Amino acid sequence: MGFMKNFFSQTRKPEGLLGKFMLGMMNYGHAKLADWGMGHLSEITPKEIIELGCGAGRDAGELLKRYPDARLTAIDYSPLSVEKAAEYNKAMIGSGRCKVQQGDVSDLQFEENSYDLATAFETIYFWPGLERCFAQVAKILKQGGYFLICNESDGKDAAGKKFENIIDGMICYTPRQIEDELKRAGFSEITTDHHPKKPWITILARK
């Protein structure tokens, strides 16, 4: 259990050799979920995007492809994730369309009302207090801006419960729990979609 716990705990804050391996797996393993989640953005044309908990950078790259006129800021509190995400999106960084930096979702150091879209793929499990973090997201979104959350766990599936027991600090939230915290943080027009065959959930909230 010691090795397994250490390995899967890399999903929370990747570091070292195991973290590098995990980040590579996450880019591949989360791709289908992220693409499904992005499919819920068909009516949105953001110019300024922030990705929260960017991991190794694959989803940031896909968002930049989806929105060729947008600029994106990607943050993660893992220095290794920031390094790998910057490598993955090197060309976009060079063109001036992408920035990757270390950041803390509980204390977002960005101008208020500056983003049209915020995304969080497979990350809120580890956020230190949803209402506080969601309020930080609301603060930096423009009025009418959107917040997209995508999770592989709906808070009730067996796999999610298993990983909660392995990874310290991981919480798999139900859609209702997420919706309630979003409302408390000031979001409205909250739409939840549950995958028909998997425990995946996508929640899209508007400020």
Question: Model features per residue range: what roles?
Answer:
Residues 12:
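S-adenosyl-L-methionine
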Residues 27-47:
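Conserved alpha-helix/loop element of class I SAM-dependent methyltransferases that forms part
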Residues 48-107:
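Class I SAM-dependent methyltransferase SAM/SAH-binding core
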Residues 106-117:
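A short acidic, Gly/Pro-enriched loop at the edge of an enzyme's catalytic core
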Residues 117-130:
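A short SAM/SAH-binding and catalytic strip from SAM-dependent methyltransferases
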Residues 131-143:
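A short glycine-rich, Lys/Arg-flanked "PGG" loop and its adjoining helix->strand segment in the class I
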